Amino acid sequence: MAARAPVHLRGFIARVALNKKNLHARHKLDTDIDKYYYTLHNVIIPDFMDMVKEIPGYPERIKKCVAHTTPSYFEGWAFSTELIYKTVADKQHQTERNLEKCRIIRALMDMSYAMAGILDDYVDKGEFRRGKKVWASVCEGGQEAAIYDSIAVTYLMSLMVKRHFGTDPGYSKLIELFNMVPGTAAIGNTLDILDRHDTNYYDDTMWKHSVQNKAANTVFPAATAGLIHAGVLCDDLLDRTSEVFGYTGHLFQVWDDFMEHYAVKEQSGKGAPDTKYNAKTWATLTAMAHFNEAQAKEFKACYGSTDPAKRSRVRELYDEVNLRGLYIDYLRNTYMVVEEKISKIPDPRIQSACRSYMDWLLVEPPQDEEEAESVLNN
């Protein structure tokens, strides 16, 4: 099947570059979000509390930690778990219990990102996540205790997977995926820190390895876990699906890099740690590839500074090389590559789920906006 060329990119991560409000719009099929939160607060958290019930006061701490931190990103991202499962699993497999288990996977994946986020906030000295103060700033014991909380919750997650999936055929594969998220996030973020000392903004070698680990390899497990829960254990199908959703991890990271400069803090839900700590990002590497000599020199003099005037000048330099347009080009090119990957998956149901997620991410406008545009065009 030939790759489709989208006429318009109006999806979730394209909106900020199109001067549209950065709506956190859900996938059109993500209609049971109330059940997601019910599972998080009435199944997972009580199970966690039960696991540590012998320790005075600790169950309540775990409850507060999870409730405050999870999800740490827009929970619509991890809909890939449910989308894959509901599209691929046979209808007779989709019992109420198996649907609940699917939501457990989704919420635990979000929790895994949240625990990695606690460590990330410590390294970046972050103050806010999703518009809320970070856990370390509100919990008893402060930063030191918060770090141990992240380790403890990650351990409880493994017990939760065993409790609910321990007898399933795909249990060992699920455990591997849940271990992958904190492990590869640690690798990627370490590379990210080390790369801050290298001011050669023309070399993207380390950045590619960092993003592969901290973004791609942490995002695709949510989708792959949904496929395993659907009963697909074929390594070839799992690998192909993982590759497709690995690209979504890259896209989320590039979107995050772009958002730091083209979204207000109220939209992004955080500050600007990349600029402050001289981090190499998609934005810096792409802009440097298009700067002339004078622009490159000025950029190096301004980037990494806390001076508001210099930070403002960085944004102006990005505008001079039309970083918005370069961002849209990157999204479009990535979409074409991923579409080709999807077309080679030898299972039409998996193809359908992958394509549906990518179209939400890049192509389809939010339903409310689509309806408004329809009225205006008629």
Curated annotation (Swiss-Prot):
This protein's source sits in the domain of life called Eukaryota
Pathway connected to this protein = Pheromone biosynthesis
Disulfide bonding pattern of the chain: none
Sorted UniProt keywords: Isoprene biosynthesis, Magnesium, Metal-binding, Transferase
Quickly give the catalysed reaction.
(2Z,6E)-farnesyl diphosphate = (Z)-alpha-bisabolene + diphosphate
Tissues expressing this chain: Highly expressed in male epidermal tissue associated with the cuticle of ventral sternites.
Cofactor note as given:
Binds 2 Mg(2+) ions per subunit.
Classification via InterPro entries: FPS1-like (IPR039702), Isoprenoid_synthase_dom_sf (IPR008949), Polyprenyl_synt (IPR000092)
E.C. code:
2.5.1.-
Molecular functions (GO terms)? (2E,6E)-farnesyl diphosphate synthase activity; dimethylallyltranstransferase activity; metal ion binding; sesquiterpene synthase activity
Query: Which Gene Ontology cellular-component terms appear in the entry?
Result: cytoplasm
As for family, the record states:
Belongs to the terpene synthase family.
Q: What does this protein do?
A: Sesquiterpene alcohol synthase that catalyzes the formation of the pheromone precursor (Z)-alpha-bisabolene from (2Z,6E)-farnesyl diphosphate.
Name of the protein in question: IDS-type sesquiterpene synthase
The source organism is: Nezara viridula (Southern green stink bug)
> Which lineage ranks, top first, belong to the organism behind this chain?
Eukaryota, Metazoa, Ecdysozoa, Arthropoda, Hexapoda
